[in-house]
Amino acid sequence: MSVPYWRLSGFYFFYFATLGGFLPYWSLYLKNGGFDPIEIGELSALLVGTRIIAPNLWGLIADHTGKSLRIIRIASFFAAFLFTGFLFAENYFWFAWITIGFSFFWNAVLPQFEAVTLFHLKNEPHRYSRIRLWGSVGFIVTVLGIGRLLDSQPVAILPVVIAALLILSWWITLIIPEADDVISYGPASFGMMKIIKKPEVLAFFTVNILLQISHAPYYVFYSIYLKHYHYSATITGLLWALGVFAEIVLFVYMKGLLRRCTLRAILLVSLLLATGRWLIIGWCADYLGLLILAQILHAATFGGAHVAAIHLVHLYFGQQHQGKGQALYSSLSFGLGGMLGSLYSGYYWELMGSKFVYSMAAVSCGIAFVIAYIWVDRENAQNTAALG
């Protein structure tokens, strides 16, 4: 069976197009709704916090049944259905419960789809970045489109746009075929805990938790931060889009990069550049040129680090535990890390100021760099051969 390149790419396009409505503008929508920074941080923490449980639960079911794509379809449907509740919610209580319900299903989707994509690619995992880049294209389309839209329309229109994108994400899952070699392994998890207990794997997860803690102030407050410095919604959208465009360029050349560089090297460089990026954003907001440079660094801080992580999980956990491995990566990094980062940035944004919050993000990346340098992938310097 040939790889359904455009259908896989289409899912990434619509999934990350949805994210392009969330990340830059959801905090603005909440602020417009009367929520303060602490409440915005808490709601953002709930949004990512369900990743701690949801991906692992769905990953366990997927590996047990061998029906990853069916789970993706069910979760995508309920995510779209529950999100429509935001069209009617009016207070913190309802926003919190709808956020939990919607995100429990939405956060289940991507880790399973990563596994489905890699199963389709079989012995060609280096092609992953060429498929994944369409997610970045989708993100850019919506972040620019919504930015222009919000210069002329109230931000209250945002939930309608996101709901439509969620429906499209669900629709495209219906036309994607199962991979030929996706099979059920039954309830046994032989070797799973043995893998997790390896010092290198524990260090890998710790590094990614710290990396996502550092990203939280950017995801939650960057647009509010730019608005405070009097940047328009269009400029804000362009800056977000620039970061993802840089990510696309990296994805285009990632196949060659994976053949020339170890995953360890890609991860270490990404962490080092992330440290500098958060310092630039925190201390140089008045200088548009430096903000542009910081956004270009998104290619490494998210794109490079994520591709390295996806491939390391693939190598660590093997075929039998792919669903659970990708889910564990998602839940610990984007879930636990994102939740902790959202909470700390929300509580300290007004108390200590934006410079302090972004400086602590840089410290988090610095610690992650040291851990990765000491423990991650030191004994497997030739892993590029498996990827090229």
Language-model segment annotations:
Residues 157-174, 356-374:
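Symmetry-related core transmembrane helices of the 12-TM Major Facilitator Superfamily/SLC fold
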Residues 53-67, 150-151, 249-263, 349-350:
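Helix-to-loop junctions at the C-terminal end of transmembrane segments
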Residues 1-2, 175-208:
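Juxtamembrane intracellular "pre-TM" segments in multi-pass secondary transporters
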Residues 13, 82-83, 92-110, 209, ...:
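Hydrophobic core of transmembrane alpha-helices in multi-pass small-molecule transporters
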Residues 100-134:
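Cytoplasmic helix-loop-helix junction between adjacent transmembrane helices
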Residues 30-31, 61-62, 133, 148-151, ...:
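Interfacial helix-cap and linker-helix signal at transmembrane-aqueous boundaries
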Residues 70-84, 265-280, 362:
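Structural signature of the two symmetry-related core transmembrane helices
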Residues 2-48, 201-239:
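Helix-loop boundary and gating motifs at the non-cytosolic
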